[in-house]
From Swiss-Prot:
It comes from Thermosipho africanus (strain TCF52B). This is Small ribosomal subunit protein uS10. Transmembrane segments: none annotated. Disulfide bonds: none annotated. It comes from the Bacteria. GO terms for biological process: translation. Belongs to the universal ribosomal protein uS10 family.
Amino acid sequence: MPGQKIRIRLKAYDHKLLDESAKKIVEIVKQTNAKVSGPIPLPTERTLYVVLRSPLKHKDSREQFEKRIHKRLIDILEPSPKTIDALMKINLPAGVDVEINL
C-alpha cells in the first residue's frame, strides 16, 4: 500500500507496561519489513484531585490524589498486508489502550 501510513496511539496508567507494549509492536512491524517511526513519547496527562480529609471541619487539612496517563505514538510507514495481519493478531496487556488510525 504505497503512500499510506498507520498511526498507533497507546495510552496507559503504567509507563513500564506502555513501553513494553510499544516495543512489542515495533518488533512485530520490523519483522514484516515495514518502516517504523517511534515510539514517540507524548506529554503525560496529569489530573490532580484535592479532597477534604474531614467531612465536617478542618478545611486546611486536605488530601491530594493524582492520575497520570502516559502516551506513546508509533507511525508505520509503507505497511504491507502482512503488517496489518500481524497487528491484528498482537496480544497486548489489559491496561493498555490502543487507538489505530489509517
